[in-house]
Amino acid sequence: MNPSVTVITPTKNRLKLLCESIDSVQRQSFDAWEHIVVDDGSDDGTAEEVARRAAADPRIRYIRRGGEKSGANVCRNIGIRESQANLVVFLDSDDLLEPHCLGRRFAVMQRNADVDFATFGTKFFRRAIGDLEDRLDSDLIGDDLVRFLFFECPWIITAPIWRKASLVRLGLFDESLLSWQDIDLHVRAIAAGFRYLRFPKMDHHVRWQFEPTKVSVEQRRSPRHLDGAIATIQKFERYVMEGPGINWVRQRALCSLYFFVAERWVALGNLPAALRVWQQIRQRRLGSRVLHVSGVGLLIIQALGGVPGRRLGNRMAHKWKGWMRMRTNPELVVR
């Protein structure tokens, strides 16, 4: 019998954490699942351990990525193509599902045949479930597209359950992007008018930890990833223009992304690159002259002021970004 839900986990050299994730899938009260583990090139015994588990439970499948392309989103796309179910959930190799997760998500999608995906609340932990109070409520009020563009993400990769057909129609994950690929998927879906539901019920746990080898950290340090981030922002702009259309709230959200990347260049000690990035808001007619000049001043303070200047610049930039985020009159921002 074919499974009803496919869980897809990309992994690389995280055997201990991966085993905990697989355990959380095997503890589901809902039985009609398959768990596809896509290995991005592990050399820590992952292949042998997952093969042992798969021999004991055929619902677990191990796939080793082939070809030159690598990365979590390449692995996720492999999992989507190989999935046998009509519904898909993404589970990172260090995260955990509540025992009721798949059953409740399956029931929601059965009751709502017209939706492309549904999202659920996230609870964070560091070492053990319950050691953090942080959570991400998927039932937040507001414009989800704007929230993603401001990096106030209303949900993360594990939160949705997708129809496989909808992911295929969306074009899967963009493997050409170096930065923000999962955000790109969600922005693309919202801008394209995909139908979805949000539920506040927490049904999974995401590990909150700092790992210097993670891509999210590399994005803050690598010029290559910062250049890639600009390409991603310009894709976001195209999605908005081709989908719901641009308005001044979305314009300032896009401006905030350019400033985010400009600040990362300052942190790398490259003020000229930061100023070139920030100039994009004028070249692309997204931000006003006032907004541009004030941003230039903050970047210069952060870059040239030494440690005291960086601290002052960071405090000023924080207040300035809050002003840009909350301002109700568009004139000083977009004209």
Where are these regions (language model features)?
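N-proximal low-complexity "stem/linker" segments adjacent to membrane-targeting elements
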Residues: 1-24
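Glycine-rich, basic loop-to-helix element that forms the pyrophosphate-binding segment
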Residues: 65-83
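A conserved acidic beta->alpha catalytic loop
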Residues: 24, 31, 39-48, 69, ...
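Short aromatic/hydrophobic "clamp" motif used to bind/position activated sugar donors
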Residues: 88
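Conserved donor NDP-sugar-binding/catalytic core segment of glycosyltransferases
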Residues: 100-132
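Conserved nucleotide-sugar donor-binding catalytic segment
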Residues: 7, 120, 139-229
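C-terminal subregions of glycosyltransferases and related glycan-biosynthesis enzymes
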Residues: 202-335
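Acidic helix N-cap motif at the loop->helix transition within catalytic regions
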Residues: 16-19, 44-52, 96, 100
